[in-house]
Design a protein with these regions (language model features):
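Non-catalytic signal-transmission and effector/linker regions of two-component phosphorelay proteins
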Residues: 1-41, 57, 61-62, 84-91, ...
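Conserved phosphate-coordination/catalytic loops
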Residues: 2-5, 46-50, 77, 120
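Short, charged/polar "capping" segments at the starts of alpha-helices
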Residues: 28-33, 75-76, 102-107
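Output/docking surface of receiver
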Residues: 45-47, 96-139
Length: 142
């Protein structure tokens, strides 16, 4: 008989499994960093908006996912502006925008559109968002 006991309540499984994630968030948002890492993502934290956008635009192939804590940078509209500034890089790197101002979570069929999450993102909502964003990557992993 096997008994499996789940200890980590912030983690919901390793859906990110080695995915390189650029997280744009203030240093104070440790929970989001830990949740992404707990889902298997290799997280690089950036605290400055234009530095993060520069990293994505200059080498989009280096990243599997971009996650932005919009509330620290002016809300959901700031996240949408950042998405628009990415231009063609936004088509290559899936984007998750987390904001307390998000009324309805959105998981768009168009893979080029950003995923919208209500902040603070729970382990479950983040897992679903990462599965959705990394869907094509997950299909080719096996």
């Amino acid at each position: 008989m096997q008994v499996i006991r789940h200890q980590d309540r912030d983690s919901a499984g390793l859906v990110g499994l080695g995915a390189r994630v650029l997280l744009l968030a203030p240093l104070a948002n440790e929970a989001l960093f830990r949740r992404i890492a707990g889902l298997g993502g290799r997280v690089d934290l950036e605290v400055e908006l234009y530095s993060a956008l520069d990293a994505l635009i200059n080498d989009p192939a280096d990243w599997d996912l971009f996650v932005m804590d919009c509330d620290a940078f002016g809300g959901l509209e700031a996240g949408r502006r950042a998405f628009a500034m990415l231009g063609l890089a936004a088509e290559r790197v899936p984007m998750i925008l987390a904001s307390a101002g998000c009324q309805t979570q959105v998981f768009p069929e168009d893979r080029r559109a950003p995923i919208l999450l209500r902040a603070p993102a729970t382990a479950t909502s983040l897992r679903v968002a990462m599965e959705h964003a990394l869907h094509n990557r997950l299909n080719f992993r096996f």
